[in-house]
Amino acid sequence: MPTVLSRMAMQLKKTAWIIPVFMVSGCSLSPAIPVIGAYYPSWFFCAIASLILTLITRRIIQRANINLAFVGIIYTALFAVYAMLFWLAFF
């Protein structure tokens, strides 16, 4: 009688072929955007939009006279969050 572990190992062997399929599924198209004849990666536009939005957020925080601790970490995290949101929303 097979044990639970051996049954799990058998199921894993049956479905292990699908892992490489998911790993190469992102290789279908290059996420590049043509601008004036040159192709720029889409993450570049997400970074630019994120930088602009982070600077706007910084200006709002400064005008509200809010003092933040760990400013570098906070703005870096905001930049990353905004970039990922732009990527999720537009690409």
Curated annotation (Swiss-Prot):
Residues 1-26 form the signal peptide. It comes from the Bacteria. A lipid is attached at C27 (S-diacylglycerol cysteine). Keywords: Cell membrane, Lipoprotein, Membrane, Palmitate, Signal, Transmembrane, Transmembrane helix. GO terms for cellular component: plasma membrane. InterPro entries: YtcA. It is a lipid-anchor; Multi-pass membrane protein. Its main location: membrane. The chain crosses the membrane at residues 33-53, 70-90. It is found in: Cell membrane; Membrane. The keyword Signal applies. A lipid is attached at C27 (N-palmitoyl cysteine). Belongs to the YtcA family. This is Uncharacterized protein YtcA.
